Amino acid sequence: MSSSNSNNGGPPLAPRLARFVRQDVQNMHAYAIQPSDGFVKLDAMENPHRLPAALQAELGRRLGALAINRYPGTRTDELRAALARHAGLPPGCALMLGNGSDELISLLSMACDVPGATVLAPLPGFVMYEMSARLQGLRFVGVPLTADFELDAAAMLAAVREHRPALTYLAYPNNPTANLWDDAVIERVVDAVREHGGLVVIDEAYQPFASRSYIDRLAHHDHVLLMRTLSKFGLAGVRLGYLMGPTALVAEIDKVRPPYNVSVLNCEAALFALEHEDEFARQAAVLRAERARLLDALRAMSGATPFPSEANMVLVRVPDAKAAFEGLKARGVLVKNVSGLHPLLANCLRLTVGLPEENDQMIAALKGILS
C-alpha cells in the first residue's frame, strides 16, 4: 500500500465526495497490472499451458449448457466434495470456497477483526496479507526473513509473543522468494501461536510445484487453516480458492462469506478441471522440469544469482534489476521487477517459468543483457 494519493491518472475526487471515502483508501495506489499484449508474459506465475483443443471444446459445451439465469446451486457442494477428494482433506476438517485466494484473505481479516487484533506475516511476502489487514482496520506486523530468505525463528517467535497475532500467515512456498521454509521452524511458530491464542494460515498457492505439503499435519492442530488456489493449477482466469481446516473453525469463517460468491461458470470450470486433473498434473510436471532447466541456465550465467525454487517462479539477483527488466522488456519478455518491494529483494527479478520456447527466449535475452 502506498502513502501517496493516486487516482489512476483521472481527475481528482471532488471534495464534497472525498469526505465520504476513507482517507487511507484515497492515499493508496491501485494494484497495477502491467500491459502484456505482444510480450512473452512471464510476470504473474500463471500456468502457460492452454487446454488441448478437444478439452477446450468439451468445456465450451459444458459452460454453454449452464443455466446462467439461476443463482449457483448444489454444484458448489459437488465442487467442495471434489476438492476435498483432490486435496486429501483429513477427517474432522471442512472446506470453504472463495473467489480466489484474495477473497479468502479478506474474509479471514473480516472474521478476525476483534478489537486490537494484529496480523503477522514474514516479509517479503504476498502483498495481500498486509493490504487486506489494513483495509479491515487491523494492525499489520511484518517480520523480515533472513538474508537467504529463510524464516528468522527468533524474530518470528519474539513477534508472536509481543503482538499475540489473531492471524499469522505462512506461505508454503513463499511468494516472491519461491522457497519452502524449514518445517521445524514452522512448527515452532505454529506452537507459539497456539500458546498465545491465534490462528495460523498456511498458504499453499504454489502446491502443484512444491515437494512438500502441510495437508497431513492439518488435523493435528485446531488453530491452523490451509489455503490453496486453482490459479497455479491452470485456472487463473477462473478465480477459485479454497480454505481447509477444523470444521468448527471453517464454519465461523464461512459465516462472513457472501452468498453465491462462486459463479456457476467458475464452479463448472473447476469441476471440469478436476475431472481432467491428469492433464494438469502433466502440465505441472513439464513446468517443474523447465524450472530445473531455467535454474541451471541462470547458475551458469555471469552476473546472475538465482535462489532455490519450489514454485513456478525463480527469484534471481542481477547487478541492476531496473536495467535488466527494461532490457528484457525491450526484447519482448515481461517479468516482474520486485527489487522495490523490500530491502532484502535489492536488484531481484521474479521470473515465471513458462513454456520451453518462452524460457529459451528469456534465457537468451537475459544472457545478452548480462554479458
Swiss-Prot record:
EC numbers on record: 2.6.1.9
Annotated GO biological process: L-histidine biosynthetic process
GO molecular function: histidinol-phosphate transaminase activity; pyridoxal phosphate binding
Pathway as given in its UniProt record: Amino-acid biosynthesis; L-histidine biosynthesis; L-histidine from 5-phospho-alpha-D-ribose 1-diphosphate: step 7/9
Pfam families, alphabetized: Aminotran_1_2
Keyword Amino-acid biosynthesis: yes
N6-(pyridoxal phosphate)lysine, modified sites: 232
Keyword tags: Amino-acid biosynthesis, Aminotransferase, Histidine biosynthesis, Pyridoxal phosphate, Transferase
Xref: Gene3D superfamilies: Aspartate Aminotransferase, domain 1, Type I PLP-dependent aspartate aminotransferase-like (Major domain)
Cofactor(s) for this UniProt protein: pyridoxal 5'-phosphate
Catalytic activity: L-histidinol phosphate + 2-oxoglutarate = 3-(imidazol-4-yl)-2-oxopropyl phosphate + L-glutamate
PANTHER family, alphabetized: HISTIDINOL-PHOSPHATE AMINOTRANSFERASE, HISTIDINOL-PHOSPHATE AMINOTRANSFERASE-RELATED
Description of how the protein assembles with itself and partners: Homodimer.
Protein family membership: Belongs to the class-II pyridoxal-phosphate-dependent aminotransferase family. Histidinol-phosphate aminotransferase subfamily.
Protein name, as recorded: Histidinol-phosphate aminotransferase
Organism of derivation: Methylibium petroleiphilum (strain ATCC BAA-1232 / LMG 22953 / PM1)
Gene: hisC
